[in-house]
């Protein structure tokens, strides 16, 4: 993650989200930016209390089973795949409540009209990325570096006079492939934030 830009100083006002949000543009985000972001409809699979040690298997099932069927039924993503976390516990038995899916240009039911997509207990549902003030940054590199990137990101949010909130999410801008260099992977990180007064 790159160092903070001048716009990330303490007390900076948020700027309007770019056209095409939640996509942030062709170039990686330089430092940390604060955005006034609109709500975005999504198509997701929701899962609760997922052990972080096995969450990769959930991703494989969602993208390998659910979304191929949804695409056949007419689902049209408006951006890269993402994972949005509404709860995350710490420690050796860390677990999360998570939504895995894609942003949409409109409501899910306007695109997928057939019976609900449900396979092996996983069900495609409509959800939303919430509106609000959102901090964003970019991580360049392998997925194994995301933990450190999130730690640095949360620290920079505090330095900007904000408190990190829930949910937080990551957008997988670069689709991984077996023969690519992990250093070329781009993941955009997002976190709903509050001012100290809101957090009190």
Predicted regions and their residues:
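A solvent-exposed interaction/effector surface
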Residues: 1-200
